Amino acid sequence: MASCSPPRRVSPDLLVSSELRRRNIWRRVTCVTGERGSPAVTTAVSSTRVRPAVLCGKAPVSETVDEKENGAATAGGGGVNAAVDVRRCEYSETAVRQKLDPSGNDSRCVVAAADSSTDSDGKSIIAGVQVVDHDEDIIAPQSLWCTAFKEALWDVALLEVPRWAWQGWKRWRNSESGRRWSAGSASASSLSDLAGEAVGELVGSVVAYVILERLWLAARGWVCETGVEAEEAMARRRQRMLWRMFSRGGDGECSRRCSMEMACEEESAVL
């Protein structure tokens, strides 16, 4: 597993109270673990969604395996155990999943941040594994086009519809059809023309927003190769850049930094 040296200076978390954090808090919940074998109980809290507590933690591997083999590990507590399939991890998060059944309800865990060491032959040995609870959206991700379509609907509903309502009302009141409507002599053809214009503008805006959202998702995935928390990763990159500018930090050297929320990434102080 790639090892990273911790940052020499930790910038303050400017995203704690941000809308981005509130949107992502239920998408991904990382278990905060203490000593090995002591599970941690963690709960995802959101104003719109509350998930039950999931027992998880860092557990030892039952047998020594190298990077090309699999082993079994068990993490849990309070009568809830998760049998985890351990694999060699290149990043802090992987797509390894295993069934978890707390109180009869099917859920899933993923393996994250496997502890590895090197033996005398130079092979990587996995010595432990951290179990992380993920939301269903991460477990069964939808296609980017589907996500872009849903985001576009929200964009249109929240941004475009109020503007259309106000500008359309003013434009219609000043038009000939609006004056005829005020006089009580509006025809069905004028109303159908108005409805057709509104539908055409709605469809065109939805298509435009879908394309824009799809391009944004593609750019976001390209910038953050892991694609799990790309939006938050990009926001944190901007945060670190602003913090360097504010504190006059940065020595011009590339550094390797590691985080439980992001894969190890190489950055430059030029950013």
Swiss-Prot record:
It comes from the Viruses. This is Uncharacterized protein UL150A. It comes from Human cytomegalovirus (strain Merlin).
